[in-house]
């Protein structure tokens, strides 16, 4: 059970602070059932009510500083999602987001950066679906790493790229050819990935 003041990841809502643990005085709600009242960190006035024993939506603690640093070191080895069928790919994105696992968010980001670069080289824009999942994955990953590392979220992409580039040489993605370490380069169209 979490305590008031804890920061947790709550499903696709992202990081929330537990502001209260209470029963709800509402019709149709058992009087003795405990609920977390959560405040999403990205919404000053937002509130989420969820049963303490909710098993339908993933709830977990924010990763530690050590876990965040380890994840960043492992980013070059995390493979993207290479699914040709649009509907199947979107379903996989949905599954990855729902898992609330940072490594799965990295997989989405790496995949979508490469797709974006490939599409730009062909004179095409990123699709609306890709853009939506890219924003969700980046938002969730960067906000969690920001809290874990005590670094402003706005500087997280550069921080990740710098950390990886300090320790890694360019790596090969087993499925698509050369991929520069870090996830920032591909976003800006500065990598050498061939589509």
Report the location of each language-model feature.
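Absolute protein N-terminus
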Residues: 1-2
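Loop/turn positions that initiate beta-strands
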Residues: 5-6, 11
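Broad gene-expression machinery/nucleic-acid interaction feature
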Residues: 13, 33-35, 47
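Conserved hydrophobic positions within beta-strands
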Residues: 16-18
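Short, solvent-exposed secondary-structure boundary/capping segments
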Residues: 25-34
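A short macromolecule-binding patch
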Residues: 37-52
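Charge/polar-rich, low-complexity and marginally structured segments
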Residues: 52-195
